[in-house]
Each structure stands twice: as structure tokens, then as C-alpha cells.
């Protein structure tokens, strides 16, 4: 089995724009939400293939783009989407992993099962070498849960990707 070709670029432009073509409209939308919340520009393209291959390839491609720019090394965010509330914390690690309390069951959103999100986030974490902690604080609607998670992941990545400013001493 050959790996699906994919490419991602991240620009720290403080604008949150996204051009995403994975072949899965729901994943395209979620990655665009991630970029908006993180206030960075994402260009992500995945060659046509199966849905499973596209999800993993997209996560890996974004992970490669993230690891190339990971500066602060950590970030966290708690963000809502309607009734859902997600908490995300991440840090640079020797071996990336996804740690979550979310039940990514067989619920369907936009024609795909919600486990798509788990596979994407796991591929992102492993490829970017980050420990990605995702906690669902509140939420019942699967679409809102995924939106809250991706927004919180984006905001946490936005923190981790920003250059750390050196301490500035002020004369008194």
C-alpha cells in the first residue's frame, strides 16, 4: 500500500486563513476552524485516495508543518462551540501522542464517522512530536464537539507556534 501524497504549509500571518483540500468536506471545515482559532494561515492539500488515507495523510502533513515551526513548545486553550466546551493542552515531546477522554464513536458528521477526528489528531501529534491532551468538558452534539476540539487545538497550536519574546527589562 502506498502512502497518500500530501503537503501542508503554515504561515504565522495572524489572519487564520485556510486553503484545505482533503477530499472530505467535514475535515476541510474542521482544519479551517483550527487555522482561524490559531490565527495562522494553513495551506493543506491531500492527493485523492480513500477517506482513511486522506485523514492520516492530512494529519501527518500538518504535523510536519507544525514541527518545523514549533517555537514556544507548548500551548493550551479552552474554547466552546455552542453547547460543547473543549480543553486542549500540548507540549513538544520526544514521542508525540494523543491523550483524550473523548469518545470518538461511530457518530456521523458530514457523511463521515467522528473517529476521523481521532485519526487526524493522532497523526498530527505523532508527526509533530507533541503530547496532545484533548478533554471534552461539556457537549453532546457531535458536530459541536468536533468544532470545539479543533478550535481549541488551533488556539493551543497558535500559542506554541509563536516566537517566545525575550524578557524585557524596563528602566525605572
Put a short name on every predicted segment.
Residues 1-172:
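N-terminal intrinsically disordered, cationic/polar leader segments
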Amino acid at each position: 500500500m502506498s502512502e497518500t501524497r500530501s503537503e501542508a504549509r503554515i504561515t504565522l500571518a495572524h489572519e487564520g486563513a485556510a486553503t484545505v483540500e482533503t477530499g472530505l468536506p467535514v475535515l476541510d471545515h474542521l482544519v479551517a476552524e483550527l487555522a482561524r482559532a490559531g490565527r495562522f494561515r494553513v495551506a493543506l492539500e491531500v492527493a485523492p485516495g480513500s477517506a482513511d488515507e486522506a485523514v492520516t495523510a492530512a494529519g501527518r502533513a500538518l504535523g510536519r508543518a507544525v514541527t518545523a515551526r514549533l517555537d514556544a513548545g507548548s500551548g493550551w486553550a479552552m474554547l466552546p462551540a455552542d453547547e460543547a466546551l473543549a480543553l486542549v493542552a500540548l507540549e513538544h515531546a520526544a514521542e508525540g501522542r494523543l491523550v483524550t477522554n473523548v469518545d470518538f464513536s461511530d457518530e456521523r458528521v458530514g457523511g463521515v464517522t467522528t473517529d476521523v477526528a481521532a485519526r487526524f489528531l493522532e497523526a498530527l501529534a505523532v508527526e509533530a512530536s507533541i503530547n496532545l491532551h484533548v478533554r471534552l468538558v461539556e457537549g453532546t452534539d457531535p458536530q459541536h464537539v468536533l468544532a470545539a476540539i479543533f478550535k481549541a487545538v488551533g488556539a493551543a497550536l497558535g500559542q506554541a507556534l509563536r516566537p517566545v519574546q525575550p524578557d524585557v527589562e524596563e528602566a525605572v
